[in-house]
Amino acid sequence: MTQNIYDNEEFFAGYSRLPRSIHGLDGAPEWPVLRTMLPDLRGRRVLDLGCGFGWFCRWAREQGAALAEGIDVSENMLARARATTSDPAIVYSRADMERLALPAAAFDLVYSS
């Protein structure tokens, strides 16, 4: 599995204090532009690669996505995402994006930022 700095406790503590970690998508400077490029998510199956704290998965469900799956290599990120998500239509799993094999047409939208 790819090594990641997010499972280093000191780094993760610092990352957790960044605006994007505290304020979610609204704290990410790229979000206003990215949001305008996204299609209508109602009824769609959405995959978030490198889901971090799960902000996009939760937002996708708020927009009507049928399913949101978040994948991350970091156990720390996944633990935070799971702790702040109660929606059964959101699933988080640990995977290495460099080795990820998905079935054809498994998702309607794949997102990563």
Indicate residue ranges for each PLM-predicted region.
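Conserved class I S-adenosyl-L-methionine
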Residues: 1-41, 55
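Intrinsic disorder/low-structure terminal segments
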Residues: 10-14, 52, 91, 106
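Nucleotide donor/acceptor-binding cores
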Residues: 43-45
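Class I SAM-dependent methyltransferase SAM/SAH-binding core
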Residues: 47, 53-99
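A short acidic, Gly/Pro-enriched loop at the edge of an enzyme's catalytic core
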Residues: 98-109
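A short beta-strand submotif of the Rossmann-like class I SAM-dependent methyltransferase core
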Residues: 112-113
